[in-house]
């Protein structure tokens, strides 16, 4: 919930998504560059805080990532997740937080995607180098 909490704290708005749980792999547009990422959320940012800029969007999520006018950034997706990690979480959540249909759709979303976890690690490292 970091992305949503940051937006809300700094004057934006976060609320439950119009759609149900969004889990699995989705494509985000990073200012013209498309990347597949792992997602698991229901809440999302719906109002951009003053001084923040949208740096990524998705078809179902207008505020997929934010860059602030101070040393901070936040993302709707989960660069720390791996497919294996999500599959294990799906096993635990099935029947509690997720329906069988949610789990099946999420697993199906992993087909034909290429997720580069190192890309976001490099971006995070660059961010900290720039602001340390």
PLM regions and their residue ranges:
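Cysteine-nucleophile active-site neighborhood
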Residues: 1-30, 34-36
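Amide-donor transfer/coupling interface in amidating biosynthetic enzymes
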Residues: 15, 29-132
